[in-house]
Design a protein with these regions (language model features):
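P-loop NTPase Walker
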Residues: 1-114, 120, 208, 262, ...
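Conserved helicase NTPase motor core
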Residues: 8-19, 23-28, 38, 58-59, ...
Length: 720
């Protein structure tokens, strides 16, 4: 069989990875080095050359989008869809496993996935029920604590509190939360992985079945795995499974959410003899950008080591701009984008990256003032929007009456006269009798223990849920969804919310009906009812794609959101000490290297043009703050960077010049471009001027000292 098509389009190192013998393998894949292509071709190689059945292959990705792309590309390469292969995220595959073995995992058949918002809502209720002060014991912190323990594989009884009263309280919250979830048949995202891991540990025959089946395991973005994910893969592989991991220790930027870059080294230790192949040829960026990225990341210690290169052009130098303040910075970026557009470039080819979401406000205002469309990447996702979650909660309750989180969300949405006092009685009964909220309502209504008006409203609500579930059981999913939206008053409620916001909510509900109409079963969903399958899809998918793409628009996003993306022109703003690297990383040991990896990720997003900006002053939290330029700027090779020198007045509050008029010489006798010497900073060049008389100020770019603003009357500069 001719398999040259699997190798012909690859470079030497990519071929080596694709055609490697079936053994444990680490592919250290640099940014833009074609790792997805290598994974896809490797899977095709295993089936075509090694005669491996698709049934024996599990491929793990970190996003549903990446999983869908991998399935599509494998199908294109092989010419047919490959049934039996498991391709998905850790959470998606764990969910599939638990559905198949729900009884062995001690879960009801109709268990539901609890997303982070509903998890928070449940924890608020539990903390209140435990008579804990929400200010002292914040529900969001409880959620972080519980998820962190699960990521480490720990149940409440595993945690050693060592007499620490704070730890003991969190342990009790975790225990109460676990019991509430078990009663209602709810599983949060961290629970999916932990429960799947426990299933294999507690049921050796099930583990053995999957070990014998999945003899070829491939994992993408391995540097982003946490402890439970690593343990999951390690357990599945056993002593006979062949594991290929693809990762880049230089792009490990999720330590704050449990990712362990050390897992790559653990893999090499746990799988002795594993081969390492480095993909260093970059197909994205110019040579200048790659030289800067290499120099930057070399300042980190303990790297596995690789150096990106390209046989493409050197490209333009990296532009560096020192802004007077954040307003100047934003206007500079917008003007550069306008120039790009005037020269025939698309707005969507331009991305503005920032360390913190709070930085976007000024940028958004500048873009609005310039009438320049923009899109915030990673904004509110479709399935996370209020109106969508309301409709989904009704559907969840129809699918499973014991879903407490769904019950809490919709029992009085729209308002139907069921107040907090009534619900508190229901909640207390639920706790006292170890019942779900639905079961507690049933018993209280039978006992006539609730006030008349509230009891009637609750009775009508429950009867409507039961009736609609029965009436729509055999209807198509989209008809069922449309009935829920109309019969429960959601559409009417949002029609009463006047203006664009209400209209947007209605349009989103209509889009949900469209989504249910277009929903198609995956192989792993074939044993589920349509409603259960769609609810699982909605919880796992959570709309990973960005906003509508019909309009050409500038892309705004955090540096974390930018990972995996690429743009012809990239701006990284706020390159200042305390901003990027963040103050937290400077205050906490061990965090600085992850910040540098984040800078590396930002730099390697750029294909053709990269611009870095920093501001001398920045208004933060209502105060004017002075920052030094980021140390990351100083770590870039001088030959790769070019400082931008603009006309004198841009956004200086003390300027007497008309905005935009260039000041070539002022009454202090200095000129733009003049070489000068300062007693402390040495030699430099005047790159900007503002004001006149005693207010005259000069911006001087000093060799090795950066750019400084000086008052001309006191600077005592000597002409060189």
């Amino acid at each position: 069989m001719d398999v040259s098509y699997l190798l012909d389009s690859l470079n030497d190192k990519q071929r080596e990875a694709v055609a490697a013998p079936r053994s444990n393998l680490l592919v250290l894949a640099g940014a833009g080095s074609g790792k997805t292509r290598v994974l896809v071709h490797r899977i095709a190689w295993l089936m075509s050359v090694e005669n491996c059945s698709p049934y024996s292959i599990m491929a793990v990705t970190f996003t549903n989008k990446a999983a869908a792309e991998m399935r599509h590309r494998i199908g294109q390469l092989m010419g047919t869809s490959q049934g039996g292969m498991w391709v998905g995220t850790f959470h998606g595959l764990a969910h599939r496993l638990l559905r198949a073995h729900h009884m062995d995992a001690n879960l009801p058949q109709d268990f539901q996935i609890l997303d982070s918002e509903d998890q928070l809502r449940l924890l608020k209720r539990l903390i209140k029920a435990m008579n804990l002060d929400e200010k002292q014991w914040p529900p969001r912190q409880a959620m972080w604590y519980i998820n962190s323990q699960k990521d480490e594989g720990l149940r409440p009884h595993h945690i050693q509190s060592y007499g620490n009263p704070v730890e003991q309280t969190w342990q009790k919250v975790y225990q109460a939360y676990q019991e509430a979830c078990d009663r209602a048949g709810l599983v949060d995202f961290a629970e999916l992985l932990l429960r799947a891991h426990e299933l294999w540990l507690n049921k050796p025959h099930i583990l053995q079945h999957y070990r014998e089946r999945f003899t070829n395991i491939l994992v993408d973005e391995f540097q982003d795995t946490n402890n439970i994910q690593y343990a999951w893969i390690r357990l599945l592989a056993g002593d006979t499974g062949k594991v290929m991991i693809v990762g880049d220790d230089d792009q490990s930027i999720y330590g704050w959410r449990g990712a362990q870059v050390e897992n790559i080294q653990r893999f090499l230790n746990d799988f002795p003899g594993a081969e390492t192949i480095r993909l260093e040829q970059n197909y994205r960026s110019t040579s200048n950008i790659l030289s800067a990225a290499n120099a930057l990341i070399e300042n980190n210690n303990g790297r596995l080591g690789k150096k990106l290169w390209t046989d493409g052009a050197d490209g333009e130098p990296i532009s560096l701009y020192c802004a007077f303040n954040e307003l100047d910075e934003a206007r500079f970026v917008v003007n550069r984008i306008k120039t790009w557009q005037d020269n025939g470039g698309a707005l969507a080819e331009c991305a503005i990256l920032y360390r913190s979401n709070a930085q976007s406000r000024v940028l958004e205002e500048a873009l609005l003032q310039a009438s320049m469309p923009y899109r915030i990447y990673g904004g509110m996702r479709f399935f996370e929007r209020q109106e969508i979650k309301d409709a989904l909660s009704y559907l969840r309750l129809i699918a499973n009456r014991n879903d407490d989180a769904a019950f809490e969300r919709v029992v009085n949405t729209p308002t139907r006269g069921i107040g907090d006092r009534t619900l508190d009685v229901v909640r207390q009964t639920s706790r006292d009798r170890q019942l779900t909220l639905w079961q507690a309502c049933r018993e209280l209504l039978q006992e006539k223990a609730l006030a008349g008006r509230a009891a009637s409203a609750l009775q009508r609500f429950m009867e409507l849920i039961d009736a609609l579930a029965q009436e729509t059981a055999d209807m198509p999913l989209h008809v069922q969804t449309d009935r829920v939206i109309k019969d429960f008053g959601l559409r009417t409620m949002y029609e009463q919310e006047k203006g664009e916001k209400g209209q947007t909510r209605i349009e989103n509900l209509e889009e949900l009906v469209t989504a249910t109409r277009q929903f198609s079963y995956n192989e792993e969903d074939e044993d589920l009812m349509p409603l259960q399958a769609f609810l699982s899809h909605a919880a796992l998918e959570a709309g990973e794609g960005q906003a509508d793409t019909w309009q050409d628009a500038v892309q705004l996003m955090t540096l974390h959101s930018a990972k995996g993306l690429e743009f012809p022109q990239v701006f990284i703003v706020g390159m200042e000490e305390g901003m990027f690297p963040s103050q937290m990383s400077l205050d906490e040991g061990g965090r600085l290297e992850e910040e540098r990896r984040l800078a590396y990720v930002g730099v390697t997003r750029a294909m053709q043009k990269l611009t870095l900006t920093y501001a001398e002053t920045r208004r933060l939290y209502g105060k004017e703050v002075y920052h030094r330029p980021s140390r990351f700027i100083g770590e870039l090779p001088e030959e790769c960077v070019e400082e931008v020198r603009l006309r004198a007045t841009v956004s200086r509050p003390v300027s007497h010049q008309r905005m935009g008029t260039p000041m070539v010489e002022n009454d202090s006798g200095y000129k733009l471009g003049q070489r000068v010497r300062h007693a402390k900073f040495g030699e430099g060049t005047i790159v900007n001027m503002e004001g006149s008389g005693e207010h005259s100020r000069l911006q001087v770019a000093f060799q090795g000292q950066g750019i400084k603003w000086l008052v001309a009357a006191y600077a005592r500069l000597e002409s060189v």
